[in-house]
Amino acid sequence: MNEVNVFYNLEGIDDTLIVTLQDITLENRTFDRKGDVARVYDRESNVTAGFNIFNASSYVEVTDNGNVTLTKEFVEKINGILAKNGFEEKVEADFTPKFVVGYVAEKEKHPNADKLNICTVEIGTETLQIVCGAPNVDAGQKVVVAKIGAVMPSGMLIKPAELRGVPSSGMICSARELELPDAPEEKGILVLEDSFEVGQEFKF
């Protein structure tokens, strides 16, 4: 299942709902428009990268600005809009929390970068390998993990990455990156109290 993200900014991109499914190379990107919907896809593989829904407010009420909180009902409405405009393809979404409490089980130095560490982080349902550059990260900590598909307050989408040759699946967050009030200026991840439960959603 693709990581679905939906964006809406009435002032920035007019009355358009942006539905992203996956990245494709810019050179191969092309469009197929039917009615108020444009399908964005790869001209070589025919893989769908997303949909742009124009005149969105005539179909659905959107109260979010920026990244839209997805619910089952909202995704059903998106699929209804696609069908109404002649597209048979359906969007499927993962509704599990994207920001969760993690436990740093192990930390080892990155073999190719002095300031990076390779962390083994348990998040309840799975164990992730995350490359982290924070100076204060250490084994035994409870931290906030942004999973693949999470959208940071800055608008940055968390994607699978490779840092200096080492795969990284997610990000260990600082208070500043989460835009928490009174976040410290100095660099460093947010270390949580031990009372937080591993795997639980982190709300902010």
Predicted regions mapped to residue ranges:
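Phosphate-backbone binding interfaces of nucleic-acid-interacting proteins
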Residues: M1-F204
